[in-house]
Amino acid sequence: TRSYGVTGVQTCALPILERQWVAFAANGSVLPRKSGVSELPMTGSVPFTAPDSMTETVELPHRGKVTGMAVPEGITLIVGGGYHGKSTFLEALQNGVYNHIGGDGRELVITDNTAVKLRAEDGRSVRNVDISMFINDLPNGRDTTCFSTMDASGSTSQAAGVVESMEAGTRLLLIDEDTSATNFMVRDALMQRVISREKEPITPFIERMRALYEQAGISTILVAGSSGAFFYEADRVIQMDRYHVVDITEKVRNICGQNACGQHVMEQVQTAAFEMPVFDRKSPAAGHKREVTDTGRERGGRRGRHGSGAADRPRTMKVKIMGKEMLMLDKENVDLRYTEQLADSEQTMALAYFMRYLLEKAKSAQTVRESVSEIETLFEKKGWQAFCSGYVPCGLARPRTQEIYAVLNRYRG
């Protein structure tokens, strides 16, 4: 078995957390990959270089002093023309929660290890999630403080994803506008005049991102390419220009009419305040009814001779994975295609064993947080043996806390 070295990442990330940064990328890092199906670095690519205004030096164990770009807490916008490296940079950041093999090129791209890559997931299930900070006053009168659906729209799935990430303890959201639901992210001024706020149940993410940081301590790094509205909310704006990083924060402030303190001169939409969700929802694994195996034999056994026979016992669930994107628990599929920070199928197999344990042994009144806490506490005490019946198979890698939440949230059973 192998683990993805959360402790190692935490050791490297310690100076980052102490300085209130959410990410760090060392000069000389190679961010592009050889191809879309390869983890090898692209040969001949432009090495990463930090802009002077964001250059910092940290001292790391076994590395000494390392210079690169520090991304501070708050709201950071990544912009630039198509094919200039915006999504490549974000992908490097989303994988910066893990240690990298030497020669990967991204060994010193380090991200807050609670970071969650967020995207729209049309068709996913949502169970008992309080999405009222984003969606309210539905035409059918449905309660959005405890919302469930087996077929979420893009905007609903992304709203649920934010709240589930908060429940999982994230300190950083990573979002690419290209893979997001447009109506969840932003509503321009003209649309707001045509369709009044009273007729629109969705409060877009742009109107909550500041409060998420100031009230919940959750920063955002957002790749944007089509809407300039995000400029008004950003603390820092970086431009990818032919794979080079340029800090254009002051330029954007001047264009948007902000003063030197970052205060908006232009009038902004006033959004109603919201209450932080209470994370006490019941775990989908709680109260799961297990199938029972009849241990008595039809003929020749004690039961066949009218004896009492052995007691019936619960049947162990079968687990199976299909690559890193799907796992099966008996006949129930859990779709993890859009859980983008899963590194490989070994983590998916570990998630399958964790889910089987919860479905077979979870307490009926257990909350989602209690379920995840039980898994992690048991793993620390007993390791893989606690989750594997009989023997521990090869090919297991420990997933992060955030991915354990993700598989629980996507279980439909």
Question: Which residues make up each language-model segment?
Answer:
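Glycine-rich phosphate-binding P-loop
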Residues: 67-95
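Conserved alpha-helical scaffold flanking the Walker A/P-loop in AAA+ ATPase domains
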Residues: 153-165
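N-terminal pre-Walker A segment at the start of P-loop NTPase domains
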Residues: 34-67
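Single conserved hydrophobic/aromatic residue that forms the stacking wall/gate
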Residues: 1-12
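Conserved P-loop NTPase nucleotide-binding/switch module
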Residues: 165-209, 213-214, 223-253
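AAA+/P-loop NTPase substrate/partner-engagement loops
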Residues: 96-135
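Conserved NTP phosphate-binding and transfer environment spanning the P-loop NTPase/kinase superfamily
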Residues: 211-217, 223-413
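Flexible beta-alpha connector loops of hexameric P-loop NTPases
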Residues: 124, 134-155, 187-202
